[in-house]
Regions:
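Conserved AMP-binding A3 loop
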Residues: 28-30, 132, 140-167
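Conserved AMP-binding/adenylation subdomain of ANL enzymes
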Residues: 163-177, 185-223, 237
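Gly/Ser/Thr-rich phosphate-binding loop
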Residues: 222-223, 239-297
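Conserved ATP/PPi-binding loop(s) of AMP-dependent carboxylate-activating enzymes
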Residues: 304-308, 319-348, 361, 377-379
Length: 473
């Protein structure tokens, strides 16, 4: 059953239960179903072709969810977007846009302005409404994922893939409410939102870190979902504001980027002891997961391979290698579909290098695009980053390879400092470390690292930034 059908189910079974909580609005399941029904009726009057997907740029999270669900109920595939993605819509075959802020329009196709007339009138008895029986058909969700490149790539998540995902993850009876920190334009935020609503529980969203932590205390939220960088941002705020109560948090689920031991220790000491790492992708969903308690002593460990996932480590020729030996990671899951585009011989290649242990733990040592070859010496950027981030005066680090005028690759490192830092002294300390062995060519102190929606450092943008800094010195 589709998540939209389940919303209508819960609207009948438990109509007054909050479905979506934000700082200025509580939307019950009955209210959400009413909104979906009314918006779906309006969409039917627009004369759109159901074979063409529709993008949405809606600021209010409850309305964004309601409009996306209404489109699916009316038979349309949906592309949740933001202002920065509008220019990428038409080149990717998406000509129709529903938006709520003037100026958020795309060239060509239909630009449809949403307003409150699409919503049902206030009613004192919303549960008495007789909803049309209209099961959701075979519709897709369309995402644009940038990963570490910063360049948006279109990905299509099929109805079948979403159904398989929900059947596997929406049965957690212990979770009552979840603060979804990740945005509603990416698979992580959308999938977790659908999981929570599918199971009749409550999704919580807020626009700022302070408002998020205030919601946790006010509504006794038990679960938090986000990228490591998003959760670290909330950790930093809690360290500054110890008066904000977060005692109700029982679990934090993080996915999308890597995080060092020091960051994990801060999160567990400040927000919640139970932190679960998820190794996942927009294209093929979850492949491995584990509480950090179980993997914290294993270098590069990202989780135990999930029972539904098939993970292989292969060499450059595609031949499987033994456990313990590094190679190219590939995997497939029931949600994975060749329709997604990032496919070779029915496997998904996330672009990571790593190995499997005999206990079924997946360990990641770097990216295939992040192997820096310095005169024949191969260095994993991730190893350098983890090494530098152990230094007390460094909050974040990112390494990349940049070719000099002769075409020889050099190791460049950018750091975000903890307070003030002596760049030359830090560079000397890094150079002297056995893991670097004098290979560092340039060190840059920057206020922040360029990151995508899930917190991954975007290495293409990083290189452009650092090359620009060299050009100005």
């Amino acid at each position: 059953m589709h998540v939209v059908d389940m919303v209508f189910h819960w609207a009948r079974v438990d109509p007054h239960r909050p479905a979506i909580i934000s700082p200025d609005l509580i939307t019950t399941f009955a209210g959400l179903a009413e909104a979906i029904d009314s918006i779906s009726n309006r969409i039917d009057q627009l004369g759109l072709d159901p074979s063409e997907p529709v993008a949405t740029v809606i600021g209010n999270p409850a309305l964004s969810i309601a409009i996306a669900f209404a489109l699916q109920r009316s038979g349309f595939s949906v592309a949740p977007a933001n202002r920065g993605l509008i220019k990428h819509l038409q080149p990717n075959g998406i000509r129709n846009l529903i938006y709520d802020v003037e100026g958020f329009v795309a060239s060509g196709g239909r630009n449809i302005r949403f307003d409150n007339s699409w919503l049902p009138p206030p009613s004192s008895t919303p549960t008495s409404r007789a909803y049309r029986r209209r099961p959701v058909g075979d519709v897709d969700l369309i995402y644009f994922t940038s990963g570490t490149t910063g360049l948006p790539k279109k990905f299509v998540q099929s109805r079948r893939g979403m159904d398989a995902h929900l059947l596997r993850f929406a049965a957690d009876a212990t979770r009552q409410s979840a603060l979804i920190v990740s945005g509603l334009t990416g698979a992580l935020g959308v999938n977790f939102t659908c999981e929570i609503l599918y199971s009749g529980k409550t999704v919580c969203r807020a626009p700022t870190p302070q408002a998020m932590l205030e919601l946790v205390g006010l509504f006794q939220i038990d679960t938090m979902v986000g990228s490591p960088q998003q959760v670290l941002g909330l950790t930093a705020l809690k360290e500054l504001r110890p008066d904000l109560p977060v005692d109700s948090l029982q679990t934090i689920i993080m996915a999308g980027a890597t995080i060092g031991r020091r960051g994990i220790d801060r999160i567990r000491a400040t927000l919640c002891r139970t932190v679960i790492n998820a190794y996942t992708s927009t294209e093929a969903s979850l492949a491995a997961l584990a509480p950090y308690d179980l993997i914290e002593g294993i270098p590069g460990a990202v989780g135990f391979v999930a029972p539904w996932a098939e993970v292989e480590i292969v060499d450059n020729a595609g031949n499987p290698v033994p456990n313990g030996r590094d190679g190219i990671i590939r995997y497939r899951t029931p949600r994975f579909s060749p329709k997604s585009g990032a496919v070779t011989d029915q496997w998904f290649y996330p672009g990571d290098i790593g190995h499997l242990t005999d206990d079924g733990i997946l360990c990641v040592v770097g990216r295939t695009s992040d192997v820096i070859n310095i005169g024949g010496v191969k260095i994993y950027a991730r190893n350098i980053e983890e090494l530098v981030e152990t230094m007390e005066d460094v909050r974040e680090a990112a390494a990349c390879g940049v070719k000099d005028a002769a075409g020889v690759e050099q190791l460049w490192v950018a750091v975000v400092p903890n307070g003030t830092v002596d760049g030359e002294a830090l560079k000397a300390r890094i150079q002297a470390h056995p893991g670097v062995s004098g290979h560092l060519s340039e060190l840059f102190v920057v206020p922040e690292l360029p990151r995508g929606d899930l917190g991954k450092v975007q290495k293409v943008r990083l290189k452009e930034l650092l090359i620009g800094l060299v050009g100005t010195t």
